[in-house]
């Protein structure tokens, strides 16, 4: 995102709810030489399965474009950990339905857990 800030352009995020959209997104971004964020919601993962993530990662690894694979609105620790194990480069845990203090503390606790997990 640093280059986007320096050059003053936006980095789009796409939710590809099916494998049919992925090639179109990749082709358009390649044509524009535009970095992008591929966001996948946990509900999409529940019906697309881990094989879809493998397909997305294969496409991402085959391009020279900077691409972020992002878990969009993870609801719990298990979803976040699963996404990281699958190879997501970014995760977001959504605590918006929680009381304010819980919403603030949930990501803090998860961040600490992930830092410990990374060093195992």
Label every PLM stretch briefly.
Residues 63-70, 117-120:
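Short beta-strand/loop segments at the ligand-binding rim of alpha/beta enzyme cores
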